[in-house]
A protein has these predicted regions:
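Alpha-helical transmembrane segments and their immediate juxtamembrane cytosolic regions
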Residues: 1-206
Length: 206
């Protein structure tokens, strides 16, 4: 529970801080001042490429190099070129998506992010239910032909980036009482969900 449940809070936290410090100022400027966003995307792209080169010998030694061009781009754009590097393409792609959608309409951004997150959740934590429905399983098989996970910048990242943008606005912040009660209650529900989805073998990836 602590390793595969509580430990997984880290990436959503990092995504929310990105929304808070990078995307919120872009929105506050009326979507005109792109400098901070462009700098963030450039720095993370360079970090991702550097990490990819660093882990290349390990991938080569382990026999995990992509076997064709499709697998290469799948790893580079969605899955990450090494297991834990999926965060980089997720935050880069997620930022681009949210920036485009939010500039058009914050409402459109929230609608997309909510639907995408539910689709992603069904393809990960609750895939054990989805695979029992042939039509839905076929749809997800199509998704998994492009990305091995729904835990990526299309499905997973946008909702947390938008949440970070939302709490950057003082009017959206919770009271101390709500935080004091909301945190422990939400952690309890998180642990219950993690325990049950593992116990019932619903998770596609732990």
């Amino acid at each position: 529970l602590f390793t595969y449940c509580l430990g997984r809070i880290a990436v959503p936290f990092f995504l929310m801080t990105t929304g808070f410090f990078v995307l919120a100022p872009y929105a506050k400027s009326g979507f005109r001042d792109k400098r901070r966003l462009v700098r963030f995307l450039r720095q993370n792209t360079l970090l991702y490429l550097a990490a990819t080169l660093f882990y290349f010998p390990i991938n080569w030694y382990a026999g995990n190099l992509p076997k064709n061009v499709l697998e290469f781009f799948k790893a580079l754009l969605f899955d990450g070129t090494f297991y834990h590097l999926w965060y980089f393409p997720a935050v880069i792609l997620g930022c681009l998506l949210v920036a485009i959608l939010a500039k058009r309409s914050m409402r459109a951004g929230w609608i997309y992010a909510g639907i995408a997150y539910l689709i992603g959740l069904a393809g990960d934590s609750y895939y054990g239910l989805i695979q029992q429905i042939p039509a839905l399983k076929a749809c997800y098989d199509g998704i998994f032909s492009i990305s091995n996970y729904t835990r990526n910048g299309i499905f997973f990242a946008p909702i947390y980036l938008l949440l970070g943008m939302a709490i950057a606005n003082p009017r959206n912040r919770c009271s101390k009482t709500a935080c004091r009660w909301g945190l422990p209650i939400s952690v309890v529900f998180l642990l219950i969900e993690g325990y049950l989805t593992d116990l019932l073998h619903l998770q596609r990836h732990n």
